[in-house]
Amino acid sequence: MTKPHLYSRACLAALLMLAAVPAETAEVKELFAIDLADYPGKEGRVIEVSYPPGAQDVVHRHDADAFVYVLEGQIVMQLKGQPAVTLKAGQTFYEGPTDVHVVGRNVSNTEPARFVVVLLKSKGAPVLTPVKE
């Protein structure tokens, strides 16, 4: 085998290994939780989500009303059956209790992104439920 041919195979092998590395995942920090006395069985949660560069979410739903406010960077959000939207710091997004969140990712592969989510949900329900497509 010639050296250029070996080099090509080595490059291909390296690319295949990189493709097998999973994307970065989001970091979630709970900031606040409270029972909503005026709404029996409901609670409010406030979480901060940090996307490292290149991070993306799994397809999921919240079974909650979710109000998103972007603090830093740019993110792409898409609900099933709707177009994707790109949001930057200061912009907002809403997910309803029956929405399936098919895309949630950091636009940048070099800069982090952060956002706050206010969730109004049934008490004891998980904050996030993965959905199989």
Identify the meaning behind each predicted range:
Residues 2-12, 16-45, 78, 93-94, ...:
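A short, N-terminal "cap"/entry segment at the start of jelly-roll beta-barrel domains
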Residues 34-65:
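N-terminal targeting signals for Sec/Tat export/insertion, comprising classic cleavable signal peptides
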Residues 36-41, 51, 81-98:
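Short acidic-glycine-tyrosine-enriched beta hairpin
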Residues 41, 61, 69, 86, ...:
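Extracellular/periplasmic catalytic domains that process cell-envelope and extracellular macromolecules
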Residues 56-58, 76, 93, 97-106:
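Histidine-centered metal-chelating micro-motifs
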Residues 62-81, 91:
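Glycine- and acidic-residue-biased ligand/ion/polar-headgroup-sensing regions
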Residues 84, 99-125:
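Ligand-binding loop in jelly-roll beta-barrel domains
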